Amino acid sequence: MSFASLPFVGLVAAGVILYYLVPKKLQWVVLLLASMVFYLAGGVKSAVWLVLVAALTWLTGLLLARQNARPAPDKQTKAAVRHVKKRICAVCAVLCFGLLYLMKYWNFTASALPSALGDKLPRWDFIVPMGLSYFIFQAVGYVIDVYRGKTDAQKNPLRYGLFVSFFPQMVQGPISRYDQLAPQLTAERCLDWRDLKFGIQLCLWGYFKKLVIADRAAVLVNAVIKDNCPYGGAVIASGILFYCIQLYCDFSGGIDITRGVARLFGIDMAENFRRPIFATSLTDYWRRWHITLGAWMRDYVFYPISLSRGFGKLSRWARTHIGGTAGKIFATSLATFIVYFIIGIWHGANFRYIAFGLWNGVLITASLLLEKTFLRWKAALHVNDKRAGWRVFMTLRTALLVFIGRYFTRAPRLRSVFTLLKTTVLHPQPGQLFDGTLLSLGLAKTDFLVIALGLIVLLALESLQERGVQIRAGLEKKSGFVQWAAMTALLLAVFLLGVFRAGYIPSGFIYTQF
């Protein structure tokens, strides 16, 4: 069930009406039923895997809670309890990530192995459940939080099931934390018109980014970025630029719809984007892009690795053989590299996604290792970090690195990445930008104008937000006429400028496949 479909709009409308009509103690049941309808619309087989993961992690949470409650009067007992908890948590994580590996990566592994070995391995054509990566990460995060004693285990399986399956987040996240989302899902609420208004505003803004900008940019991207691309480097670079536009408006637009729908029920979901276009480094970019995935990797991968006993030994060895500061940075850099390697694999079972993770991992690791050298250069050149020119330079440099990285995530295969990059650099053929080639790729002049105007609006609003301007709070101070006029203008823009064609089939979101 696509976000950009009438059945979804009908489900949300019916859900909101029922939510505020039923007794408050049953409101969470309405959310659970709506989530069941949404997920079952994608097929019963997919729902089975969701139920299995939810059941496994719920039971694991109860087992861990029982261990947490065990009396531990001495160090020996505490150590024994900790050992049992680690084993319980490890078994659950292996089963969950094993399922993820089996469904998303097994066939890729078999095909990547040498034929003498890979040909002997069976292939399975699984239908990967919608949101598999997202709900597994969210459920395992809950288990780890219970293991750490950060949150109490949920005893009610249906309430826990709602946390795992809450329908707005099933398409592409965000990856929520139990202590932040679960209490909101089961809270009792009265109708708040501000929540409805903010929710509608967020949804309309998300649909604007998705249907007006992203889906229009996708037409050019699909026409250019493909195997045996016949165009010169300038057109290819334009295709990647439009892909960057498509990806951001598609992903952030979908998250806006997710957060908007949740807000209709009075639920404030985690922010997943913070104006990544203004990032001044790759590290800063990943703090602004897909925030909940980065936070998950930080809390459940980076810290456990860097604080582990093995990494402690490695850090001490590095400080002894490389030097105090350099040794400490070496261990941190290695943990960082591992995280971005995993982020690359998370995006998909393809060597180009692994290369994407390595691209980011190598650059960010290098920045950590060379940070002091870079600071010395800045001091020698008397660079003022606060000057606008320096910030513009850092932002453009980061944008270029992100731009190059997008060749990896959009090219059909890894070999195509290097072919497209080579053509971009060695055979630019800039004349194709002006000889009518761009207008032969499926977009008319009016489409380019709509994209340009949409981006101007988007950049203007995000620029204000970057400066600390609270746009919705400012709009709230305006008269009711101005507020409804703004929402009406957005609604008209979506319906009049959205990419709806004859026989329209709602387009999916790019990050759904991840």
Language-model-detected regions and their locations in the chain:
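Membrane-embedded transmembrane alpha-helical bundles that form the catalytic cores
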Residues: 1-513
